[in-house]
């Protein structure tokens, strides 16, 4: 994980405080950035339904997604194994079943079927079908919009986050310097791009972090 468990728990506490103020017992987050912010989850798995569930009565978020992607959740998050759940493979692109039928069942199993639940209505990966599955199978839930709830909290950076951003800026500087030094008449564009990518991901001896895939 990029940050400590204490950092993630501090973020979770802030989110729960706002949830309580907005009378939300549970929120379902599908924005990959918000999933990462609260758990550390990092994976290109948003091609299928996935998300995290934050509940006032649970000490940790719940990650849900495809079974094969759950391994990534175990590697990149601080969550206990019991809080990483996955739907069966035969729920994927197999109407009339749908991954959010699994989410709906989880809501009922945890006695949230009469609670106030927030969802990110304007999140790119929260589809109309996702919402329909929830509202049709959880008719007694009071659903409300939690779009930007976490995003506004993310706006105020901790000291650890600021330090990480400063290290990231050094990577950008290294990439720009590499471009400046290698862009010349007659040099192939692909050669320069490779050099830049190497700097952005590999960094140098002065940079404490390494870049990620781009």
Which residues does each PLM region occupy?
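Active-site cores enriched in adjacent His and Asp/Glu residues with nearby glycine-rich loops
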Residues: 3, 18-36, 125, 172-214
